[in-house]
Amino acid sequence: DRWGRIDFLVNNAGIGSPKPLHETDDDTLDQFLGIMLRAPFRLARDVIGHMQPGSAIINVTSTFAVVGGLRGGAYSAAKGGLTALTTHIACQYGPLGIRCNAVAPGVTLTPMVAHRLEDERFRKINTEMTPHQRLGRVEDIASTVAFLCSEGGSFINGQTIVVDGGWSSTKYLSDFALNAEW
């Protein structure tokens, strides 16, 4: 009420864990779903009544919500649920002029993945399997979010925009790529 209306909501929260599904306990699953699905659901629910036509909700998901992965079942499940929520919001609130889209980053240079990037093999595989031959930067994701909130993105609704330099197009998630000697 203090600000009168909300023009844009960007749900950008995540935690990571490389655990496979069979090693993920219920507490970990609940934590992942709480941070990456339940919180964005609640935020969208609570702000949608304050949004006007032309407003937008942007959910930051992951390439692992789009192409799957060999590890991180709780992460993929939560981000996949957020992708589904994105399309639901777009369909339900699009007639009111409120858009909802998702941005699905690939491996991006953030504090969340910093420890993984210390592993030279991980860094090399992800860099070389990306046609752009580099990892994502925060600016790559931020500029996509800004575009989706702008007039230029006004006719985009219910979409997941993958921002990974082509990484998901390379079939990275094969046993060969994960076990290759670089």
What role is predicted for each listed range?
Residues 20-21, 28-33, 126:
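Substrate-binding pocket helix/loop in short-chain dehydrogenase/reductase
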